[in-house]
C-alpha cells in the first residue's frame, strides 16, 4: 500500500497527473516518476484518429517519466544508499587485494572464476566488474581505500588463503571466509 493524497489545483494545465515523490535524507521531497493525461497537446498538434464508426476523434496523450529526471533519481538513490550501491549496480563490484607476490597464481584462479560467472536476470550477460590491487602497500591501506571507494565486495588473498584454498571476503557490513570451490556461488548470491 502506498500513501497518497490528492493535491487539487496543483495539476498541470493539460490534465491530471500522478507524481511519485521520494524524500531525501534532509526530509525534502523530490518528484521522481510521473504519469499524466494530456488533453491540450493533441488539440494543438491537430491529432486525430478514426474510431470504429469511421468518425474522427481527438486522442488523449499519456506522458510518463519512469524515473523522472535521471539526474534527480540518481541523486536521491546515491543519497539513500550513502554511496553503497547494491552489488549488481556498483561500478566496481569486487576489489581483490593481494598480500604479496607469492599469491599471483592463486589470484589468477580467482580471476578465472570471476570471468566464468553468469549472473541471473536481470544481470545476465553482465561481466563481474573487478580490479586486482597488487600494489606494494599495507593491507590496511588497501582495505581503507577500497572501503572509501564503497566497493561492495573485497576479496583478500594471502598465503594462508592459498594454503587453505579459501578467500577472505569483506562485505560492507560483514566478513566471511569462502572456499575457493564455493566462490562462484557465493558471488552469484550477492545482492
Spans of features found by a protein language model:
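NTP/phosphate- and nucleic-acid-binding module
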Residues: 1-191
Amino acid at each position: 500500500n502506498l500513501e497518497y493524497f490528492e493535491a487539487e489545483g496543483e495539476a498541470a494545465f493539460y490534465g491530471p497527473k500522478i507524481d511519485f515523490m521520494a524524500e531525501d535524507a534532509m526530509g525534502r521531497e523530490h518528484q521522481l516518476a510521473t504519469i499524466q493525461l494530456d488533453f491540450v497537446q493533441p488539440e494543438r498538434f491537430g491529432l486525430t484518429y478514426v474510431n470504429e464508426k469511421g468518425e474522427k476523434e481527438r486522442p488523449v496523450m499519456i506522458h510518463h517519466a519512469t524515473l523522472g529526471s535521471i539526474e534527480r533519481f540518481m541523486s536521491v538513490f546515491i543519497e539513500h544508499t550513502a554511496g553503497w550501491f547494491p552489488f549488481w549496480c556498483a561500478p566496481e563490484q569486487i576489489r581483490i587485494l593481494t598480500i604479496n607476490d607469492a599469491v599471483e597464481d592463486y589470484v589468477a584462479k580467482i580471476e578465472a572464476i570471476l570471468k566464468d560467472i553468469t549472473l541471473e536476470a536481470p544481470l545476465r550477460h553482465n561481466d563481474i566488474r573487478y580490479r586486482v590491487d597488487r600494489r606494494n602497500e599495507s593491507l590496511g591501506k588497501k582495505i581503507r581505500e577500497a572501503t572509501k571507494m564503497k566497493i561492495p565486495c573485497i576479496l583478500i588473498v594471502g598465503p594462508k588463503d592459498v594454503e587453505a584454498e579459501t578467500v577472505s571476503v569483506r562485505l560492507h557490513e560483514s566478513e566471511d571466509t569462502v572456499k575457493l570451490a564455493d566462490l562462484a556461488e557465493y558471488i552469484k548470491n550477492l545482492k
